[in-house]
Swiss-Prot record:
Organism listed in the record: Anaeromyxobacter dehalogenans (strain 2CP-C)
Gene name for this UniProt entry: rpsL
InterPro entries hit by this protein: NA-bd_OB-fold, Ribosomal_uS12, Ribosomal_uS12_bac
GO terms (BP aspect): translation
Modified residues (3-methylthioaspartic acid): 89
Name of the protein in question: Small ribosomal subunit protein uS12
A Pfam family this chain is assigned to: Ribosom_S12_S23
Lineage of the organism: Bacteria, Pseudomonadati, Myxococcota, Myxococcia, Myxococcales
Amino acid sequence: MPTISQLVRRGRERLQVKKKAPALKESPQKRGVCTRVYTTTPKKPNSALRKVARVRLTNGFEVTSYIPGVGHNLQEHSVVLIRGGRVKDLPGVRYHIIRGTLDAVGVQGRKQGRSKYGAKRAS
């Protein structure tokens, strides 16, 4: 345990809080270009083919992000907007692609929770 004079001279070092979405660099969203669009399988108790994309961001980071909703139109070189938010059963996927912006079209025929999937109101 340090003495009072040692603390006066040096002080205590602050603990660094680990960021959950470091590639965003404090921004709410970031734009990027898809370098690879593919499906992957989730962790142990679950079973599915989850749609994910590898995205090169404007700040140089390359991240894996989840494509939410049923069906998508994304392919290599599609420009997308990503937000933070991990997918619990996909290790290493810490970002979501925002549907209905840039090249990612909204989910077709969606009636409820439309704002999360970029779906326009059915008229």
